[in-house]
Amino acid sequence: MSLEKIETVNSLNLDTQKNYHYDTFYSTFKAWLYIDDVELNDGPFYYIKNSHKISFKRLILEWIFSIRRSFNKNFDDSFRYGNSLKNQKKLNDIAEKFIDKKNTFIMANTHGLHRRGDSNVNTVRNTIHFYSRENPFKIIQ
């Protein structure tokens, strides 16, 4: 658990969390407690409903990602969709946007496709952030 302060200080889109991505190849969760109201221009959480479910297409994407990752040591650890405006808009149209009042608690399986929404310059979003990421290879006794 940690206090998370996200501050947008310029208009450059250098925040990789704003690209749709899967955190891991297995189920994990993250949660946020909004300390302040979060509007559309405050960087709300976006989530593609049911994207955490395993499908044949998803398995192929994970396999391709793992092969690319094995040959490129500078490759990002999580699978990220390109940040083209066309891809973002298409996904934004179907994403659930968590625009909520303060004291709202949001929990998501981050094996699903998600991102941080865009925010205006000089915007601050304060949350209490929780996450759980177990080792998928641990031996169960």
Which residues does each predicted region cover?
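Double-stranded beta-helix
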Residues: 41-109, 113
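Short beta-strand segments enriched in hydrophobic/aromatic residues
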Residues: 35, 112, 132-134
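Alpha-helical and His/Cys-centered functional microenvironments
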Residues: 25, 118, 133
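Conserved hydrophobic/aromatic beta-strand scaffold that supports enzyme active sites
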Residues: 19, 30-34, 95-97, 105-107, ...
